[in-house]
């Protein structure tokens, strides 16, 4: 067996992390031959709950879990980690504006970015989940300048998975028969879920998803709003944020980043925008379709976009630029 990987999960006493830590410790992410040491970070006030999480992980007797480091200390949490799954963030409370949430959370991610820069391995792969994920990811990367911006991504796989399910259900096929949906832009209700280039395998043949579904009204009035607002819909029914689906998406995104995508398939990931792809603004974390090989992602270029699609793309891009400016202004 290779040496153990040190995997940090922040917000470790929360519901997403409760699901996620079990998936990682069970080998769902890095495989059954890779030993894991889990670093579990949360605030001191969550210590009792975190102790309970640790007890459950111990009681599972996972074969790949080589150690657990529960802590509220940033140095202990970030030292020598290989992977950071940044789940923890301040939740949006009643009466709180998006601007308030941004201001609170970017300060958390500034502090954690500084700790990452100081203590983590320079090869660390960072996946930001806590919202607003794209802008938190940008701030964290800015305060960890010794780590390449390509080593940071924000979670878009949950939106990607939601889109796959909706297309599969509409087409009457299993989820495994849908590939190459796109999520463009922000992880917010201004994201652009796009099935213009998606492919559905049905009756042994591959079909363009839009041609097979052949229902533009459904695409614009059902599919896109459903994916954009799915998180809020789950909260409305459960009275709790999505947890299991988010944990599964985190594992999916990091596993593909670690091991690579299948030939002929892409996935959606929020990555650093250099300004060279589809006219997306520079210096934001923006969701693109990507292929991945040997731990390195590559944006899929050359996909066509009509005028209506471009307007949705630009709407999400504008929101991310606005978020960036609000976030950076909070440090002045």
Curated annotation (Swiss-Prot):
Catalytic-site annotation from UniProt: 187
Quaternary organization: Homodimer.
Disulfide bonds: none
Name of the featured protein: Malate dehydrogenase, cytoplasmic
Enzyme Commission number(s): 1.1.1.37
GO cellular component: cytoplasm
GO terms of molecular function: L-malate dehydrogenase (NAD+) activity
Main location: cytoplasm
Keywords: Cytoplasm, NAD, Oxidoreductase, Tricarboxylic acid cycle
SUPFAM superfamilies given in the database record: LDH C-terminal domain-like, NAD(P)-binding Rossmann-fold domains
Family, as annotated: Belongs to the LDH/MDH superfamily. MDH type 2 family.
Superkingdom of the organism of origin: Eukaryota
Catalysed reactions, semicolon-separated: (S)-malate + NAD(+) = oxaloacetate + NADH + H(+)
GO biological process: malate metabolic process; tricarboxylic acid cycle
First-tier enzyme category under EC: oxidoreductase
InterPro entries attached to this UniProt entry: L-lactate/malate_DH, Lactate/malate_DH_C, Lactate/malate_DH_N, Lactate_DH/Glyco_Ohase_4_C, Malate_DH_AS, Malate_DH_NAD-dep_euk, Malate_DH_type2, NAD(P)-bd_dom_sf
Organism: Echinococcus granulosus
Residues annotated as binding substrate: 92, 98, 131, 162
Subcellular location: Cytoplasm
UniProt xrefs under PANTHER family: MALATE DEHYDROGENASE (PTHR23382)
Ligand binding (NAD(+)): 11-17, 105, 112, 129-131
